[in-house]
């Protein structure tokens, strides 16, 4: 029942963080906030569906229009509604399997056995993108035994970036990044996104990475954040 201002609720595992999100959404709607003006962000589709269902159990039809989604799904929906605004017109989204296939091809079958596998390369690439760390720092933290192969790994990742550009692909990390960049650099895009919401409710805030926070930070002056 706090007033309309940013809030961060700190709680340990098993303390009812999701229940708090449900209660907050129900309170806001009961207090007059239109349900479609609330966007809930969480980390799995299952939890997103569960939160909406639990709010509907409390409020019935008045919760119609409440939206809950993962960060990726939310960003994809924004891009699809305004692809030109995000510089993503005529791009295709690729999933993890597509990424693995590209890394397998670019790594090559005859590569040194010391070079990380396609799956490991994919994980290293994603970790660096989501944390903002350099390849050097990423390898030291996550794969020190592969550090001697840093130059080859860098070449594979540069080739992966080039292949995506050539084929007009967006992977899941690109989706977050392009939205975050536009929210930060384009007042028009930022205002367009912010105009759709009164509140952003973030579940499991402790699990957010720097890239996900870059999505929220530009909106903090126009949308009220409630993070648990």
What spans do the regions from the language model cover?
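Conserved helicase NTPase motor core
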Residues: 1, 5-10, 20, 39, ...
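P-loop NTPase Walker
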Residues: 1-89, 167, 191, 223
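Alpha-helix C-capping/helix-to-loop hinge sites
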Residues: 10, 58, 62, 85, ...
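Class I S-adenosyl-L-methionine
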Residues: 49-52, 56, 104, 161, ...
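Coupling/switch/interface segments within P-loop NTPase motor domains and analogous charged loops
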Residues: 96-164
């Amino acid at each position: 029942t706090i007033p309309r201002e940013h809030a961060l609720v700190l709680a340990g595992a098993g303390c009812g963080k999701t229940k708090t999100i449900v209660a907050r959404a129900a309170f806001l709607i009961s207090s007059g906030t239109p349900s479609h003006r609330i966007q809930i962000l969480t980390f799995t589709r299952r939890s997103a569906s569960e939160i909406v269902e639990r709010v509907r159990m409390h409020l019935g039809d008045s919760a119609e229009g409440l939206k809950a989604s993962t960060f990726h799904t939310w960003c994809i929906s924004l891009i699809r509604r305004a692809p030109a605004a995000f510089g993503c017109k005529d791009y295709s989204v690729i999933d993890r399997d597509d990424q693995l296939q590209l890394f397998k091809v670019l790594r090559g079958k005859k590569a040194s056995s010391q070079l990380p596998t396609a799956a490991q390369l994919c994980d290293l690439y994603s970790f660096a993108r989501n944390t903002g760390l350099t390849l050097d720092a990423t390898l030291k933290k996550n794969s020190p035994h592969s550090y001697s192969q840093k130059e080859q790994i860098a070449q594979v990742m540069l080739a992966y970036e080039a292949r995506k550009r050539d084929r007009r692909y967006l992977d899941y990390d690109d989706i977050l990044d392009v939205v975050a960049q536009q929210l930060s650099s384009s007042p028009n895009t930022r205002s367009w996104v912010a105009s759709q919401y009164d509140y952003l409710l973030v579940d499991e805030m402790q699990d957010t990475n720097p890239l996900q926070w870059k999505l929220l930070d530009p909106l903090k002056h126009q949308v009220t954040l409630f993070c648990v």
